[in-house]
A protein has these predicted regions:
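A contiguous, basic/glycine-rich beta-loop/short-helix subdomain that forms a polymer-engagement track
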Residues: 53-70, 85-92, 223-330
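Conserved phosphoryl-transfer catalytic core
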Residues: 107, 112-194
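Residues immediately C-terminal
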Residues: 82, 108, 300
Length: 336
């Protein structure tokens, strides 16, 4: 996904396949000249500098940035390059190093970290993928059908466990008081819910009956993507691949810090694996370096942020504002 954001091709292929890209094909034959030119010049490298060098030497700007970072004393980036389990800089943080982390606006990190370790999957993406494949049988279609059926049964179970009250139903979300005949159990049985109301069910245990068929989609989906790089449905199925990958990776991390949320809306079922407490994951990421300083103008109370960020032994320092009080001014408008 990041590759596509950095892509300098006028019509970049959505799959970002090296064999189809002139900037990626033969990359290592040209990267040394690009690095030499950059390192002999300015001491800082922004996106424009990377794009310019990438065009000049016909190399992928995304990979160029990664290789260049190993020659830099300071790397400035978004939280996810350290904390996100999918896109963190593996060349630096898959093992410990002599790094110093400076985390600005750290009051935003708890919510960002929860989002990074959580995942969401919608049943409709399976239905749309089957439709995009068209007619004919294939291993991928079989896997998609099995996963779609499992989520369909989960939707029925969800509605039966937590029927939506008709007073809260609108035209976009038809009444779901029952999708099954009375006293008929759904084909898929969900774990005992923590909470169930209005077509939403929360579970402590991950729903293995849904995750197993989603895992089974991965191999045939990857095979199809590799075999059909120019297919019209390639971009759509690539997004499905990422979504399946996200939810199955979240399932691998799933422990007592997570809950599962299932929500039925009309024909849709939304499966979410929600990380409620990211503290152990943030702590593990910070442990990849020698030390860390997390700072913000609103990082209070410190005891709360120590808890949610896993920094139980961290020292807290509060400083007075560097701005004179006379610089503050509050104006209340008069509204007639």
């Amino acid at each position: 996904r990041r590759q596509r954001q950095m892509c300098i091709r006028d019509r970049g292929h959505p799959a970002c396949l090296p064999e189809l890209c002139p900037y990626a094909n033969g990359y290592y034959d040209r990267i040394k000249d690009a690095l030499t030119a950059l390192l002999d010049g300015t001491g800082s490298f922004d996106r424009a500098a990377l794009a310019g060098a990438a065009k000049r030497f016909s190399v992928c700007p995304f990979e160029l940035g990664l290789d260049l970072s190993e020659w830099c004393d300071v790397v400035i980036g978004d939280y996810n390059y350290l904390f996100d389990p999918v896109v963190h800089l593996k060349r630096f943080f898959d093992s410990s190093g002599d790094w110093l982390f400076l985390v600005d606006e750290a009051h935003n990190l708890p919510d960002r970290a929860r989002a990074m370790y959580s995942a969401r999957f919608c049943k409709s993406s399976l239905t749309e993928a089957k439709r995009a494949l068209g007619k004919g049988k294939s291993a991928l279609k079989t896997a998609l059908t099995k996963a779609d059926k499992a989520l369909l049964e989960a939707r029925k179970a969800c509605v039966q466990l937590a029927p939506r009250h008709s007073s809260q139903t609108d035209a976009a979300d038809p009444a779901q008081t029952s999708l099954l005949p009375e006293n008929t159990a759904p084909a898929l049985e969900l774990p005992e819910p923590l909470y169930a109301q209005d077509s939403t069910v929360f579970l402590q245990e991950p729903p293995s009956a849904l995750l197993s068929p989603l895992r089974a989609v991965q191999a045939p989906l990857q095979d199809w993507l590799e075999a059909n790089p120019d297919a019209e449905a390639h971009a759509q199925l690539l997004e499905l691949y990422f979504a399946v990958q996200d939810i199955t990776r979240a399932a691998e991390r799933y422990d007592s810090h997570f809950v599962t949320q299932l929500t039925a809306r009309g024909r849709e079922l939304e499966l979410q694996l929600l990380c409620l407490d990211p503290a152990p994951f943030v702590d593990a990421s910070l442990a990849a370096g020698r030390s860390a300083a997390l700072f913000s103008a609103t990082l209070a109370p410190p005891s709360f942020y120590r808890s949610v960020l896993g920094c139980s032994d961290a020292r807290a320092v509060a400083l007075d504002s560097p701005f004179p009080v006379s610089y503050t001014h509050l104006t209340l408008p008069t509204i007639c």
